[in-house]
């Protein structure tokens, strides 16, 4: 699904990612752990080109999305991302937050289809003709129905018309996750989704992520939650100083780490 080849990222003289090559297959749940400053979050942000790689390839569905000639927005629709600090719009209600991107993307697609229909009628047959197209009102109604169903899934349908400022951190993060799901992504990237939460709120977010794992959602997760890595990951990767030092299945990774650096890290966090 995603094939990263010789990925490098530099900020001036600071070489953050160093020749990273890794494949992520459909249905995998890859958990990335490591000390702060090891490049984990930068790697994640490069995967959907929120950060432009200095060099290397990120091949998604056969296309190098790191190539600046590629329309990255076409591919970002298929790669969801959940941030550490939720990134909800405080001036919009919960349901508006969930609906915003799906409505914008679908409206844009309909406008393009209408343009193609017009060109087709003028005789430019290379443009596809779409028989029936939804109105803006129909798009909004459909996306609202989908957003409501997602809120019901996490038991927060009564929060639909409330604003993010009235929610707990755990509620905000679960809404951020279903906002990503509303785009029907093929893969979701999680950047330390529980690190900004109070300890008592962590469990509800991890449970939702475990549910997604059971549904075989492709996930790449940067986290310090070792329990989640053990239970939900299909593969665990250890990063340090911009490199992927070690990777293995959770059972083998935690019971029999190979590198001294990984052994030292696990000895400090598994207490």
Regions found by a protein language model. Give the residues of each.
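Helix-to-loop junction immediately C-terminal to a conserved catalytic motif
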Residues: 48
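Conserved ABC transporter NBD signature motif
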Residues: 56-67
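Conserved ABC ATPase "signature" region
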Residues: 64, 99, 103-158
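ABC ATPase NBD coupling module
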Residues: 65-80, 104, 134-144, 214, ...
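Conserved ABC ATPase signature
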Residues: 163-167, 171
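A short, proline-enriched helix->beta-strand linker immediately N-terminal to the Walker B motif
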Residues: 182-186
């Amino acid at each position: 699904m995603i094939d990263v080849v010789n990925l490098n990222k530099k900020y001036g003289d600071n070489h953050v990612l160093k020749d990273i090559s890794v494949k992520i297959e459909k249905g995998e749940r890859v958990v990335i752990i490591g000390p702060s400053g090891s490049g984990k979050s930068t790697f994640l942000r490069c995967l959907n080109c929120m950060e432009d790689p200095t060099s290397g390839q990120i091949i998604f569905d056969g296309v190098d999305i790191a190539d600046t000639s590629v329309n990255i927005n076409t591919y970002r629709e298929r790669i969801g991302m959940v941030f550490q600090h939720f990134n909800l719009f405080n001036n919009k209600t919960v349901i508006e937050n969930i609906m915003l991107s799906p409505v914008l993307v679908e409206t844009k697609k309909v406008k393009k289809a209408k343009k193609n229909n017009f060109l087709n009628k003028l005789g430019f047959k290379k443009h596809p003709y779409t028989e029936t197209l939804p109105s803006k009102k129909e798009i909004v109604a459909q996306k609202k129905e989908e957003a409501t169903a997602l809120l019901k899934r996490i038991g927060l349908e009564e929060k639909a018309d409330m604003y993010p400022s009235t929610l707990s951190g755990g509620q905000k993060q679960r809404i951020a996750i279903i906002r990503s799901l509303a785009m029907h992504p093929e893969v979701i990237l999680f950047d330390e989704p529980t690190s900004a939460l109070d300890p008592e709120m962590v469990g509800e977010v991890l449970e939702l992520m475990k549910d997604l794992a059971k549904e075989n959602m492709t996930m790449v997760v940067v986290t310090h939650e070792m329990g989640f890595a053990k239970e939900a990951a299909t593969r665990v990767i250890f990063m340090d100083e911009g490199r992927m030092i070690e990777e293995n299945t959770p059972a083998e990774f935690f019971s029999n780490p190979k590198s001294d650096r990984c052994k030292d890290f696990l000895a400090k966090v598994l207490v």
